[in-house]
Regions:
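Short, hydrophobic beta-strand segments that form beta-sheet elements in well-ordered domains
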Residues: 5-7, 70, 191-197, 211, ...
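Residue-level marker of beta-strand positions
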Residues: 65-67, 82-83, 120, 172, ...
Length: 341
């Protein structure tokens, strides 16, 4: 069959290409239905990545957050029409120690490999996780981002000491909101503190016990463990603030992505005996746990619906441009594309 793939060939330039695919393989064929734009996609779309990176990664189809319906499954795992979340990480080897999302040989969609802006996506059955029938598809569209926070939480549970009375979350954006929400549900008795720089964003964190502007943190604030969800150059200040306020022997999870190296106060990391770990991307197991959390705590999807800042029907390439340009103006929330190509 001929599959149409909508590739970014240069910043703000998307073209359709044609890819001949066979149905006589072990791949499940999925028709995308709802996709969500990520900051990483925007960096490619706007050309804010380095010229070297763009030359290496483009052309490629963007988007690694999305759901779709199964059209054909030779494995018999999914019935035709089943709504599934697509896992963008594609490992090429197995390792007993290193997780598939940390293997340097793994391929990640919309990062040098075609993402979900296609008529049909071809994936192995183990790259798909069924979506609950009653889940809002606009929320399900960015399940991948939620699974990233779930992955960080799963790693935390293995690394951190068991005194989990107070948590601090730095970052008032989408990832900070999701991470804080998960902590609220998984540790309902713990005190949840959120730190950010924009009051209008902090107002969304109604489930937190306390919210603080990063320039107005009381001297007596403290917490057992912290999660950095800032990214960019701002992650430097967030990490160092966390180091200042965290109780000794606490654990710090770093989730924010920065293009540049940042300076952190290693002296106090040593002095306080802190555990610092990085967390990136996710696995099918994280997607599965995310779906379980959606069903165990129905108010999680309800809260996440507050992140849907705009929904665009995509019927032509110009609609993709409109969605991306609109997303650039959003200070908070996720832009969702209903894929009708």
């Amino acid at each position: 069959m001929i599959n149409q793939v909508y590739q970014l060939v240069a910043p703000r330039q998307i073209e359709v290409t044609y890819d001949e695919r066979s149905l006589n393989t072990d791949r499940v064929v999925v028709r995308p239905t709802y996709l969500s734009i990520c900051h990483a996609d925007q960096r490619y779309f706007t050309g804010s990545r380095s010229a070297e990176v763009l030359a290496k990664k483009l052309p490629m189809a963007m988007i690694h957050e999305g759901i779709g319906k199964v059209v054909h499954d030779p494995s018999g795992t999914f019935k035709k029409g089943t709504l599934v979340a697509m896992v963008p990480n594609t490992p090429t080897e197995e390792d007993d120690i290193i997780g598939e999302n940390y293997l340097r040989t793994s391929r990640f969609r919309s990062s040098g490999y075609d993402g979900y802006m296609q008529d049909y996506v071809f994936l192995k059955a183990d790259r798909l996780v069924e979506v609950p029938a009653d889940l809002d598809p606009e929320v399900a569209a960015f399940t991948e981002l939620v699974s990233v926070a779930v992955h960080a939480l799963t790693r935390f549970e293995k690394i951190a000491h068991p005194r989990r009375e107070t948590f601090g979350v730095w970052g008032d954006g989408n990832l900070g909101f999701i991470t804080a929400l998960l902590l609220r549900k998984v540790y309902p008795e713990a005190k949840l503190l959120v730190f950010g720089k924009t009051q209008s964003k902090l107002d969304y964190f109604s489930f937190a016990d306390e919210t603080y502007h990063i320039d107005q943190i009381p001297a007596d604030v403290s917490f057992n463990h912290g999660f950095e969800c800032v990214g960019g150059i701002g992650s430097q200040y967030a990490i160092n603030q966390m180091i200042d306020y965290i109780i000794p022997e606490g654990t710090m999870a770093l989730l924010g992505v920065s293009e540049d190296a940042v300076a952190i106060n290693t002296r106090m990391i040593l002095e306080k005996g802190l555990r610092v770990y990085g967390s990136s991307r996710s696995t099918p197991a994280d997607f599965a746990r995310t779906m379980e959390l959606y069903q165990t705590y129905p108010d999680i999807p309800a809260y996440l619906s507050n992140l849907v800042s705009g929904v665009f029907q995509i019927r032509q390439i110009e609609d993709i441009h409109k969605a991306f340009e609109n997303d650039l103006t959003n200070r908070f929330g996720k832009t969702v594309m209903e894929w009708c190509m």
